[in-house]
């Protein structure tokens, strides 16, 4: 499953949170994420104190466990998402989307 994760960091937690993240090595980041999450892309709006990523994992529980590592520092939203191929498969078989 693919998940879109967004985060926003409150002003009072911004500098400590970004300092902690900025000090992490690639290995630290992988350890923080765990072995069962594949990071497909992550982007940061540093001035806006927010960002997002797309990850792949077997379950929401796996992604939620990673999110708990940062839950005290930022507001996190996790949404299951589909790529174009999967979305088209759902839409093509849905009765509301069938051509008449």
What label would you give each PLM region?
Residues 1-100:
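Conserved, structured core segments of small domains
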